[in-house]
């Protein structure tokens, strides 16, 4: 049985730690800082870091890779189409990779960055900065059309999929979601719950895909209420769901 834990980093990052208690081997996802991982390894003598999974090239996701590689000789997996430090295995869309005995499917999800990938294994999704709890990543390199397509691909996964994104942005994302859909009771309920969780210092991840479909405006571009608000914001009739997405993303960037 593999256990998944979060190692907080910086102000709002989570490094996901996968632990196989039988073999005492572990893997990490997007270690932007080596220190939390090294501290965990020091507190757990006998454990070996065998693998590092990277979703994209931004420093807050790869900053700790080289130091961890030097410390552990872990195998570094990352997107083939991006420059990833100390990468051993470059991954493309639809490839499969075995980590701690689990087989992960790789999805190309361009938008936040052009080479961004996500890792999926039977109800678990490690999606970096593509899909957030109640939100999505900014478009630093890709187009709105690319990001909308990437999110649609992730949204096609089973509803009970657990969403392991890498930032604690849920509260601010839900405030935006409520501005988009002020009459949505699911958003109001989730906002109240998340507000309480954050006041108690608790993390709000992982999310579930089912919950995202109810409360994440970027997965709800086909809803009439969302389209109407997007049309109202940019003063035009958005003819496609990707156009609705683009209007929402531009609004969120300034929210």
Swiss-Prot record:
It comes from Pseudomonas fluorescens (strain ATCC BAA-477 / NRRL B-23932 / Pf-5). Zn(2+) 2 binds at residues 60-61, 129, 167. Thiolesterase that catalyzes the hydrolysis of S-D-lactoyl-glutathione to form glutathione and D-lactic acid. InterPro entries: Clx_II_MBL, Glyoxalase_II_hydrolase, HAGH_C, Hydroxyacylglutathione_Hdrlase, Metallo-B-lactamas, RibonucZ/Hydroxyglut_hydro. One of its GO terms (biological process) is methylglyoxal catabolic process to D-lactate via S-lactoyl-glutathione. Binds 2 Zn(2+) ions per subunit. It is an enzyme of class 3 (hydrolase). Keywords: Hydrolase, Metal-binding, Zinc. Its cofactor is Zn(2+). This is Hydroxyacylglutathione hydrolase. Its EC number is 3.1.2.6.
């Amino acid at each position: 049985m593999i256990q998944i834990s979060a190692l907080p980093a910086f102000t709002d990052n989570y490094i996901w730690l996968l632990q196989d208690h039988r073999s005492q081997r572990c893997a990490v996802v997007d270690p932007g800082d080596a220190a939390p991982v090294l501290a965990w390894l020091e507190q757990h003598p006998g454990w070996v870091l065998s693998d590092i999974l990277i979703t994209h090239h931004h420093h807050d996701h790869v900053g700790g890779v080289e130091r961890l590689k030097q410390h552990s000789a872990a195998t570094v997996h990352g997107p083939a189409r991006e420059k990833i430090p100390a990468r051993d295995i470059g991954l493309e869309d639809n490839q499969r990779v075995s980590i701690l005995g689990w087989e992960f499917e790789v999805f190309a999800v361009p938008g936040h960055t052009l080479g961004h990938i996500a890792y999926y294994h039977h109800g678990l999704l490690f999606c970096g900065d593509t899909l957030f709890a109640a939100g999505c990543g900014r478009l630093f390199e890709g187009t709105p059309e690319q990001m909308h397509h990437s999110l649609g691909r992730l949204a096609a996964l089973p509803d009970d999929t657990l969403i392991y994104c890498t930032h604690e942005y849920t509260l601010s994302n839900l405030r935006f979601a409520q501005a988009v859909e002020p009459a949505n009771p699911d958003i109001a309920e989730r906002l109240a719950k998340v507000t309480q969780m954050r006041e108690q210092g608790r993390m709000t991840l992982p999310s579930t895909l089912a919950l995202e479909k109810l409360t994440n405006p970027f997965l709800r571009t086909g809803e009439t209420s969302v389209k109407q608000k997007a049309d109202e914001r940019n003063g035009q009739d958005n003819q496609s769901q990707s156009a609705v997405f683009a209007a929402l993303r531009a609004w969120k960037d300034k929210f």
